[in-house]
């Protein structure tokens, strides 16, 4: 219907599922000076201020990135804090303590009050290898918390994360196509 109305494919994405028992293999190669830690659950506003600053830098070259103010960013994310599980919020920090990457995971609340899946929702990094360390840490934490599966959500088909998800044995269960159309005038 949309294509017949002049819309064309702009980008393709997918979501995939992987049993967590299959992702807890060998630790990724060490990345000099990076440590991955879980969020301690304190000061969520400070957490999101750091995430905002890193996100701006890590995302600025993404095709659909549109800058927003820190105030707007905080207004968007602070309401979800009560739904967050601190053990699924991870940070990669350099030896000087500065933030090199972050990962947000959430329980799959669509499965009801006792979800069996955790969703690797968003991650961004500024250092090579940080994303891989964060994903590994997420899988370990989710497995430790009793989740059976991880969902790698909304991954661009041509992103490094797509290759990593496939290498971990994830099976695609949903595909998405972003359509667009140039408007006249």
Located regions from the model:
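Short amphipathic alpha-helix that is part of the acyltransferase structural core
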Residues: 28-69, 99-100, 185
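Generic surface-pattern signal
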Residues: 56, 60, 78, 82-85
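Short, catalytically relevant binding-site loops at active-site mouths
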Residues: 43, 73, 109
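Beta-rich nucleic-acid/ligand-interaction surfaces
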Residues: 67-82
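Active-site/acyl-donor-binding loops of N-acyltransferases
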Residues: 1-23, 79-81, 87-90, 95, ...
């Amino acid at each position: 219907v949309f294509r017949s109305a002049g819309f064309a494919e702009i980008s393709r994405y997918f979501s995939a599922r992987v049993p967590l028992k299959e992702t807890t293999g060998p630790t990724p190669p060490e990345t000099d000076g990076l440590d991955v830690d879980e969020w301690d659950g304190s000061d969520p506003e400070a957490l999101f201020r750091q995430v905002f600053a890193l996100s701006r830098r890590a995302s600025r070259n993404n095709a659909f990135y549109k800058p927003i103010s820190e105030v707007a960013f905080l207004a968007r994310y602070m309401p979800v804090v009560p739904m967050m599980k601190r053990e699924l919020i991870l940070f990669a920090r350099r030896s000087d303590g500065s933030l090199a990457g972050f990962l947000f995971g959430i329980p799959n609340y669509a499965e009801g009050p006792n979800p069996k899946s955790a969703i690797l929702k968003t991650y961004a990094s500024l250092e090579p290898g940080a994303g891989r360390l964060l994903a590994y840490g997420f899988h370990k934490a989710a497995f430790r918390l009793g989740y059976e599966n991880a969902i790698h959500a909304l991954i661009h088909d041509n992103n490094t994360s797509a290759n990593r998800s496939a290498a971990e044995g994830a099976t695609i269960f949903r595909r998405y196509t972003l359509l667009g159309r140039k408007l006249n005038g």
